[in-house]
Amino acid sequence: MTTLRCKTVIGGSAKGKAMVTRQPINFTAAMCKVPNMLPSKRAEIRDSHHELFKQNIAGRVLVFPSCIGSTHTGLVLLDLVSMERGPAALVVQRNDSLLIAGVVLSNVWFDRKIPVVEYESDDLYDLIRDGADVEVDGDAGEIRVTNP
């Protein structure tokens, strides 16, 4: 097991399988498509230009560089987390307020919290591989990784 020190953005702890991408994610473009709408309410990346196309982020530890795109990003994450379809945790290289707004609101409004941590170094993708078992401890500022 490898333990990484990180910056806490939103505390809490979670664990799950890593879903890793080096591409920034536009959550609005990725999630606001017909297969993710009612009644099925899935959590699949539906941006056909993204390497995670057709992958389900629910319950995964999402590891990515940053978010891009719309101010709607927070609302997309709010919807996913409040419906229990969101990722288990977010590990991001460059955090921003658009990314965490929905996560904060899901905690305040629905008492559903997911940890968000920032790990800025580019060795992130060498240290956490897709499918790794990851524990994110936002309270301690640690990411614990067991790679396959």
Regions found by a protein language model. Name each.
Residues 3-14, 19-144:
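Feature captures the catalytic cores and cofactor-binding loops of soluble hydro-lyases/lyases
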Residues 148:
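Active-site/ligand-binding-proximal alpha/beta "capping" segment
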